[in-house]
Amino acid sequence: MQSESLFIEKENYTLHLKRFYTKEKAPSVFLVHGSIEDGKIFYSKSGKGFAPFLAENGFDVFVADLRGRGKSKPHPSRDNNFGMASAFEEDIPDFIAKIKSIKGKEPDHWVSHSWGGVHLMAYLAKNEAPNLKSMVFFGSKRDIRVKNLKKFLIVDLLWFGYCTFLAKTKGYLPARQYKIGSADEAKDYFLEVNKWVRSRDWKDLRDGFDYAAALQQKTLPPILSITGANDKQIGHPVDCRRLLKEIGDQDNFTFKVIGKQQGYQHDYDHINLLTHKDAKDDHFREVLEWLKD
């Protein structure tokens, strides 16, 4: 298996795209991470993870570092602020264009973790993707309505409370310094994500464009949405299932909970759904077969 780092030079920033492949003419997969993380949710320094797994099994894999995350520079700071729409109006189109310049066409499959699914769907609401064959969500939700102690502590107190205070006072969210996440977030990006997470309506914060209504009018590709049985707050099954309903609940959508009760090896949570050492011999195999079909 080969890997390489590709860079997209913009006027005031650089985007990083990590590629894993065993053969260049393989079908392509585009992977997008979520909030307070970077593309390494899909791979490790030692070459393990979902992205290398796909490459070893016949796919040409491209992993995004959205603006300011991972090797995309500069990182967020008081002087480097940007909003959430930068991800789906600028970064994702740039990544897709880069993949097209290499492959000759747009990526065949799109995969997301957590909030990355919202970015991809927001992009699709306003753009066509005629070459797109399928999508996979790992723990992707758009809003959080579940009520339990973990949600109260992690989402309400930590995210909406303490992290909002940090972002406003420091000018960005220093998630790495405070061990809240693996990547820092720009202030406006973080605050705007929170507004969508708390809102019943999926509307643009600038002009009121209704993303859900737009997506419901489209014929979307097959979507496989999975989440961990032990994901109690960030990607709770109830909230992840509701995202599929919000975008039209088409017949070609499939939703699965990954846990012992469903026949899997572990009750996975929001992170180890992608990072657990047993995942490649558990649900990764199922996702692989789904992509190949």
Residue ranges and their predicted role:
Residues 22-75:
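Short, surface-exposed "cap/lid" segments of acyl-processing enzymes
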Residues 81-100:
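Alpha/beta-hydrolase active-site loop
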Residues 101, 105, 111, 115-206:
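Alpha/beta-hydrolase-fold enzymes
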Residues 225-227:
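Short beta-strand/loop motif that positions the catalytic acidic residue
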Residues 229-232, 271:
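Acidic beta-to-alpha connecting loop that harbors the catalytic carboxylate
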Residues 232-239:
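Conserved alpha/beta-hydrolase "acid-adjacent" motif
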